[in-house]
Amino acid sequence: MPFIDLQTNLPASLFTDDFLTRFCSAAAAALGKPENRMNLVVSPGLRMLIAGSSSPCVMVAVSAISVTDTAEKNKEHSAKIFEFLTKELNLSDDRIVIQFHELQPHQVGKKGTVMSFL
């Protein structure tokens, strides 16, 4: 059950329902998870800096159980997510940063319990 949180200073008009669907699909494929398990939030129009510049940029946080637990896995995930975002948003790769957070099953609640019991 991955969680993707994309924050950006790009305008909301770029983030259509179609973009969200395509990003969800790309992120699911990158992480090897089914699309119906993905959770995605896009927060556009923020005041942001990356590397001291307020030029168009994106920060992404990826939190997931058992798929973000090694540098090797995250390197692969990063490459696929960067490929999608650079093409879709016309950004250079130095204007995108990704944070990976490993979650444990007891840290994710669903259906009135936690994933440890589902």
Feature-to-residue mapping (PLM):
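Interaction-mediating elements
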Residues: M1-L118
